[in-house]
């Protein structure tokens, strides 16, 4: 035991209350339920990250034991790195409301600088009337597992969310689309995934891939062919 975490039942603030931080207990590093979930994570090669303690408890009650939650904080790079050491795939599960989409976008942003080629991050956005607790009670564990297994990959979620924010139906929209994609592409550490996303962004923005690379000030590690004399 390195600390305690509490969650208000019903209305009240603060929603989450944790022990004071110490050298052993830092919220930005710890995940609720990770110790209990480790065996299931190793078995499934997948970990599901939900927003709250009670979501973890409800999922475990229905036999889904590979779920963890942050300690009332936003996802950090420390969380992502810790989970990637445990699993091949992270599924971030958020409510489908505006707050959930904001939290998902933050999780995507911090994942880009930690996700290597060969690992997977997915995003499962529930319908606005559900959180993981209510969904698994209403639809059952198998439905939740199926949704987690087929959740949107980071690449798909990133590009579709950018296009939702900046529709690419006009030149101005495409300009905003590229401008918002730029810092995300630049922070990626997975060169193969980065190149594929660069191509997707260029296609949607109706730009030549090399022109986009130049505009973003990026270099890609492409194999070069040597001309024979």
Predicted region positions:
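Phosphate-handling DNA/RNA-contact segment within nucleic-acid enzymes
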Residues: 1-86, 90, 104
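A charged alpha-helical hairpin associated with nucleic-acid processing machineries
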Residues: 38-47, 74-90, 94-229
